[in-house]
Structures are given as structure tokens and as C-alpha cells.
């Protein structure tokens, strides 16, 4: 919603065996300004972040972040470790904030914070929340929410919902090994 304007896009995302993403707009409605100036730029940023070089520099790993355990919490009914994360470099795709790690499966279930580098001069601050859900054997994005405070235009809220996952076992096996090996 921007200037009391709304926009919506339904986008099919495909992720190949290397992790690179492609996007296909299925339908769109609402404000052309919001779709073209905000949503399409977000899609392009996600495509860029999925490319191999950028992906390695933005993974939530000790190579890219410093971690500090701050406590335990229950997230979506599951016991979780809460860690503070601080990026080691300034990168628009890195987040400064907290992560929730499932205490049983050690998967990241939630990320909250702000970008390590401000995405634009025109934006004062951005708060983001990423939520993940288990889909079969995998933890995949379920919802991304962000609130940007712009210098001139005020507050912009964006919500992205992920659903209808189709996982190709052939691609998974090519990246991770045979499925039968996982159960051992």
C-alpha cells in the first residue's frame, strides 16, 4: 500500500539446481507505480541475490556473520534458539538482527532485523521479518514482511507469501545425494 494505493502480483519462482532463481509474473493488479517501482525492483533484487557469487556472500554462516546466543523462545509451537546476528561486511542482502533456530532440526525458522546497508538514500529505515516452514524434508520461505520508512513518501508495507511448492527430487539428489541416503 502506498499513498493509499495497493498492488498485487502472483509470481511463479523456479529455483534451479545451482540455487539461481527465475521469476514469471502470472497475474498483477493495482497501482502501476507500486508494481513497477517497488515490486518489480524487489523481484530483481531477489533474482540478483540468488546468483552464485552473491549467494555465497550472503548465506547465514560464520564466514558472513558473527553470532551470539541471546536465549530460547517458542516459535510456531517449536522450541528455538534465538541468536543475534551481525554481518561482517556491509551488503544490502545481509541482515543485522536476530534469527530463530529450531532446537530439534537446527533450521532457521525466522529472521528479524534490518539490512546491513541501507538500500537507498530515499529510505530512512527498513524492518524485515522472514518466516520459514517445513515442507517435507525442507525448511522453505513461507512469508516475508517488510516496513520501509521513506524520507518523502512515508511508510511502505510489503508482504510476500510463498506457497504451492513443487520440489524436484531429481534436482535435490543432484545437489545433495540420493534420497534413500537421507534416512540412514
Q: Which residues make up each language-model segment?
A:
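Structured extracytoplasmic
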Residues: 1-96, 103-107, 116-126, 133-140, ...
Amino acid at each position: 500500500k502506498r499513498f493509499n494505493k495497493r498492488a498485487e502480483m502472483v509470481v511463479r519462482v523456479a529455483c534451479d539446481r545451482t540455487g539461481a532463481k527465475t521469476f514469471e509474473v502470472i497475474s498483477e493488479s493495482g497501482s502501476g507505480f507500486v508494481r513497477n517501482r517497488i515490486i518489480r525492483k524487489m523481484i530483481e533484487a531477489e533474482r540478483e541475490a540468488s546468483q552464485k557469487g552473491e549467494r555465497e556472500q550472503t548465506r547465514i554462516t560464520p564466514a558472513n556473520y558473527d553470532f551470539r546466543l541471546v536465549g530460547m523462545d517458542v516459535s510456531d509451537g517449536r522450541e528455538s534458539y534465538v541468536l543475534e546476528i551481525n554481518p561482517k561486511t556491509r551488503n544490502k542482502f545481509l541482515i543485522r538482527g536476530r534469527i530463530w533456530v529450531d532446537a530439534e532440526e537446527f533450521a532457521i525458522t525466522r529472521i528479524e532485523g534490518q539490512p546491513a546497508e541501507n538500500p537507498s538514500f530515499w529510505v530512512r529505515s527498513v524492518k524485515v521479518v522472514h518466516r520459514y516452514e517445513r515442507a517435507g524434508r525442507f525448511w522453505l520461505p513461507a512469508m516475508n514482511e517488510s516496513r520501509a520508512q521513506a524520507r518523502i513518501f512515508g511508510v511502505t508495507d510489503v508482504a510476500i507469501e510463498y506457497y504451492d511448492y513443487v520440489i524436484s527430487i531429481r534436482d535435490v539428489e543432484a545437489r545433495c545425494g540420493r534420497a534413500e541416503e537421507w534416512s540412514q
